[in-house]
């Protein structure tokens, strides 16, 4: 019996599920001939159905009095009377103005709206119903600006949120709806349109001048603020075309600050394109520029490309770099540094970004700041150095590594003495902005068991321990040669070495050398030296360039690289436009067999007196003369690394024949001097006295298991042969392009034989870095290892600088 009881209950529930008392149904009035008419209003009749014991509401069709629509069928008389009263007051304007209403589906929608939104006026209902003819009814027109509902919104608000442009036109043209009326949240129709999905609605609203376009809601947001917050790029575009103001202050600043806060790049770009001054606007709360609000590298890069001041300060004195470090945003930090942010800028309480980084336990960020010039012993307003901050905040393991690093410059871990305030007074003055720990001396730290021992010497290497104040003698009697290896993005290592030489000598690289030779990336840097570009600038350029050039898979598109070279050196600049120092770039002429080394020069080539190694071929086109050679094409030709980029015409990467151009440069100088003597200009010849060769870092040596290539007799031998062929191919390429080893030995021996000072500077890297490496962390670590190398070879650097500065 219990089973049958549960079955009956289940069937009853299912029946109730499908029996909706408010389901609209088309009926014949003849079916109600025996029913009593309880109420009657216009075309609506409330009938008591005796057979079903229900109260039915029937809408008599104006077109056919014999038929109608049952709007509900209720068992409670009280409920029936309430609903009948509601229907009778709301339905007449609809069936009186449009025959489209007289359909079951439309009536169902309309009656559901009436029940679900009892506070809505007939005009609100008409908007949701979406039948245009209804808006010509006098009663619907009369309620066009009504706010009598739970949200306090007008029918125009609903039309905008719905995105119905046709209904919007009806409301504005026939019903004279006002566009500046606000709802309970202070929002106008423009706010609602922004939250919709139809930009055309916003465009139609903007055709008529209205204060609602720039009205702030209860949260202080204009429609433009709201569009930026929601990332509605097209809405932002339409608002700006409708002359929405960009300079209205919201709770978080101008709309540009809102776009930056929510990382809406497209919206920010729209605003800046309309009003470029917005890029410098300051928010009211922090006095911060849009760059301070950048939360990722993409947003920061977008602003910086458009000329945003990278070192702009907030009301507290902090730069965007301070904020990025505080938020531990390494990608943002790298973008700011590569666009020239001052790594040593003093912000609130005199803190530099390095002070703030010490509390983040992010070694990569600390390395990046130091590599880009942050001083490790700069005290803040409380006299605290980064070392002191590290000793009080950082986690144990990282703290040990950081203190090991900073101890090498004699950083004081005690709370320092501030002029006019004793240590005890300053300690009792109150909590420090960073922490409120005791100012006691931390325990002595042993340097024997600390992690990251290689970090120890870096900071000291950056100190001007061997800076010499003497300047170059312009009438130097000997020539200096600088040779730069190839190596792709590892050219950053060369840049870091040159920065160290410039810092130690106090003289620009261009003024230290008379000859500069470069291959591939070294060729680009040679041209940068020729055109007086600072190495600090080139370091940032390289970090930015890699993301533009190394996109997709190899071989990479040549377009981005060529555009980069044109942008840096000019599209029409010729090699001979700048005469000093003399520069040569290596390239490989690949339109002949065997291939030949070609030098792109900014001077006339010496006349050859030796017999050519091959019989001249009249079918081969001669190289372009220096006076006609475009600088960017020379750089592109020298850097056309096979499998990385397609050849530049007939030129391949110079690294195929001279990845270390030292011997080729010395040969060129000798031939140039001999040519000068033959021409009777021997008085202009200067003896070469110093050769400086800079590498892009030595990869660690690893064992190779097999380079055997043979005809296999079984699957196992086939796999072994394939692996051996791969290793052999890699070895052949490495041998052809090896800038170290015997190439360095030969150059050093030659220099020693003729009495030339030879310096080979090439740091050992901890890992093999590819030519197209794009990871900021990997490249920063390579520069860090370069800084370690600089310190370890500081005596060699000191000797080099002394020789370079001597007459």
UniProtKB/Swiss-Prot annotation:
Coiled coil: none annotated. Residues 482-666 form the PNPLA domain. The keyword Protein biosynthesis does not apply. The modification Phosphoserine is found at residue 13. GO terms for molecular function: 1-alkyl-2-acetylglycerophosphocholine esterase activity; ATP-dependent protein binding; calcium-independent phospholipase A2 activity; calmodulin binding; identical protein binding; long-chain fatty acyl-CoA hydrolase activity; lysophospholipase activity; phospholipase A2 activity. Keywords: ANK repeat, Calmodulin-binding, Cell membrane, Cell projection, Chemotaxis, Cytoplasm, Hydrolase, Lipid metabolism, Membrane, Mitochondrion, Phospholipid metabolism, Phosphoprotein, Repeat, Transmembrane, Transmembrane helix. The chain crosses the membrane at residues 481-501, 512-532. Residues 749-760 are annotated as: Calmodulin-binding (IQ motif). GO terms for cellular component: extracellular space; mitochondrial inner membrane; mitochondrion; plasma membrane; pseudopodium. A motif (GXGXXG) lies at residues 486-491. Expressed in pancreatic beta-cells. Expressed in skeletal muscle (at protein level). ANK repeats lie at residues 120-147, 151-181, 185-215, 219-248, 251-281, 286-312, 316-345, 349-378, 382-403. A motif (DGA/G) lies at residues 653-655. Optimum pH is 7. It is found in: Cytoplasm; Cell membrane; Mitochondrion; Cell projection, Pseudopodium. A motif (GXSXG) lies at residues 518-522. The keyword Membrane applies. Its EC number is 3.1.1.4, 3.1.1.5, 3.1.2.2. The active site is at residues 520, 653. Pfam families: Ank (PF00023), Ank_2 (PF12796), Patatin (PF01734). It catalyses: a 1,2-diacyl-sn-glycero-3-phosphocholine + H2O = a 1-acyl-sn-glycero-3-phosphocholine + a fatty acid + H(+); a 1-O-alkyl-2-acyl-sn-glycero-3-phosphocholine + H2O = a 1-O-alkyl-sn-glycero-3-phosphocholine + a fatty acid + H(+); 1,2-dihexadecanoyl-sn-glycero-3-phosphocholine + H2O = 1-hexadecanoyl-sn-glycero-3-phosphocholine + hexadecanoate + H(+); 1-hexadecanoyl-2-(9Z-octadecenoyl)-sn-glycero-3-phosphocholine + H2O = 1-hexadecanoyl-sn-glycero-3-phosphocholine + (9Z)-octadecenoate + H(+). Homodimer formed by catalytic domains tightly interacting through a large hydrophobic interface. The contact area involves 3 alpha helices, several loops and a part of the beta sheet from each monomer. Both active sites of the dimer are in close proximity adopting an open conformation that provide sufficient space for phospholipid access and favoring cooperativity in deacylation-reacylation reactions. Each monomer has 9 ankyrin repeats stacked side-by-side in an elongated structure oriented outwards from the catalytic core. Has two putative calmodulin binding domains, the 1-9-14 and IQ motifs. One calmodulin molecule interacts with PLA2G6 dimer, likely through 1-9-14 motif on each monomer. Binds calmodulin in a calcium-dependent way. This is 85/88 kDa calcium-independent phospholipase A2. The gene is Pla2g6.
């Amino acid at each position: 019996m219990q089973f049958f009881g549960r079955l009956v209950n289940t069937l009853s529930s299912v029946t109730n599920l499908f029996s909706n008392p408010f389901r609209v149904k088309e009926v014949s009035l003849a079916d109600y001939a025996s029913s009593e008419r309880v109420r009657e209003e216009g075309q609506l009749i409330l009938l008591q159905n005796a057979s079903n014991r229900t109260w039915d509401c029937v809408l008599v069709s104006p077109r056919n009095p014999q038929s109608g629509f049952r709007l509900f069928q209720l068992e409670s008389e009280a409920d029936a009377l309430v609903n009948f009263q509601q229907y009778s007051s709301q339905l007449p304007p609809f069936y009186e103005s449009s025959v489209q209403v007289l359909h079951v589906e439309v009536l169902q929608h309309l009656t559901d709206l009436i029940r679900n939104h009892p506070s809505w006026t007939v005009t609100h209902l008409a908007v949701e119903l979406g039948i245009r003819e209804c808006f010509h009814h006098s009663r619907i027109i009369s309620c066009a600006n009504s706010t009598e509902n739970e949200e306090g919104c007008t029918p125009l608000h609903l039309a905008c949120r719905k995105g119905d442009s046709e209904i919007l036109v009806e409301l504005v043209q026939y019903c004279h709806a006002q566009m500046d009326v606000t709802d309970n949240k202070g929002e106008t129709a423009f706010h609602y349109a922004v939250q919709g999905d139809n930009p055309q609605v916003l465009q139609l609203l903007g055709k008529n001048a209205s204060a609602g376009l720039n009205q702030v809601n209860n949260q202080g947001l204009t429609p433009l603020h709201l569009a930026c917050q929601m990332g509605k790029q097209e809405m932002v575009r339409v608002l700006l075309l409708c002359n929405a103001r960009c300079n209205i202050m919201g709770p978080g600043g101008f709309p540009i600050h809102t776009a930056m806060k929510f990382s809406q790049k497209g919206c920010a770009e729209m605003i800046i394109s309309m009003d470029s001054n917005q890029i410098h606007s300051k928010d009211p709360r922090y006095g911060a520029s849009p760059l301070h609000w950048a939360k990722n590298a993409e947003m920061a890069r977008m602003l910086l490309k458009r000329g945003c001041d990278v070192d702009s300060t907030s009301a507290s004195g902090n730069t965007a770099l301070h904020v990025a470090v505080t938020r531990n945003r390494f990608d943002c930090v790298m973008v700011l540094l590569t666009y020239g942010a001052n790594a040593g800028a003093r912000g609130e309480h005199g803190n530099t970004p390095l002070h703030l980084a010490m509390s983040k336990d992010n070694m990569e960020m600390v390395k990046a700041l130091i590599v880009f010039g942050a001083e490790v012993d700069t005290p803040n307003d409380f006299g605290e150095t980064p070392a002191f901050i590290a000793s009080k905040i950082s986690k144990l393991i990282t703290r040990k590594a950081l203190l090991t690093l900073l101890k090498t410059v004699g950083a004081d871990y005690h709370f320092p003495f501030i002029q006019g305030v004793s240590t005890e007074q300053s300690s009792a003055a109150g909590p420090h902005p960073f922490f409120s720990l005791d100012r006691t001396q931390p325990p002595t730290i042993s340097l024997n068991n600390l992690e990251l021992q290689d970090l120890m010497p870096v900071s000291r290497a950056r100190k001007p321990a061997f800076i010499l104040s003497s300047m170059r003698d312009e009438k130097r009697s000997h020539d200096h040669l600088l040779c730069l290896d190839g190596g792709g993005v590892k050219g950053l290592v060369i840049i870091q070495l040159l920065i160290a030489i410039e810092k130690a000598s106090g003289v620009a690289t261009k003024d230290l050398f008379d000859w500069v030779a470069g291959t591939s990336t070294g060729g680009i840097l040679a041209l940068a030296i020729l055109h007086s570009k600072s190495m600090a600038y080139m370091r940032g350029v390289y970090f930015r360039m890699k993301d533009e050039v190394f996109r997709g898979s190899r071989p990479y598109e040549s377009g981005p690289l060529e555009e980069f070279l044109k942008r840096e050196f000019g599209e029409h600049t010729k090699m001979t436009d700048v005469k000093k120092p003399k520069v040569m770039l290596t390239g490989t002429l690949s339109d002949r067999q065997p291939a030949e080394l070609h030098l792109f020069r900014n001077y006339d080539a010496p006349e050859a007196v030796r017999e050519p190694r091959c019989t001249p071929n009249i079918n081969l086109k001669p190289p372009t003369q220096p006076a006609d050679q475009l600088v960017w094409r020379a750089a592109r030709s020298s850097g056309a690394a096979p499998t990385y980029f397609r050849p530049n015409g007939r030129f391949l990467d110079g690294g195929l024949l001279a990845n270390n151009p030292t011997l080729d440069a010395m040969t060129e100088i000798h031939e140039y001097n001999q040519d000068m003597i033959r021409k009777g200009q021997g008085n202009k010849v200067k003896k070469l006295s110093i050769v400086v060769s800079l590498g892009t870092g030595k990869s660690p040596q690893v064992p190779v298991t097999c380079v055997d290539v043979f005809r296999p007799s079984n699957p196992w031998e086939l796999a072994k042969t394939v692996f051996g062929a791969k290793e052999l191919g890699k070895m052949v390429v490495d041998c052809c392009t090896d800038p170290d080893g015997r190439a360095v030995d030969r150059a050093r021996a030659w220099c020693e034989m003729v009495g030339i000072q030879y310096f080979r500077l090439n740091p050992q890297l901890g890992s093999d870095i590819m030519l197209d490496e794009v990871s900021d962390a990997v490249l920063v670590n390579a520069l860090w290892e370069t800084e370690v190398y600089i310190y370890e070879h500081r005596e060699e650097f000191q000797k080099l600088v002394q020789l370079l500065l001597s007459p």
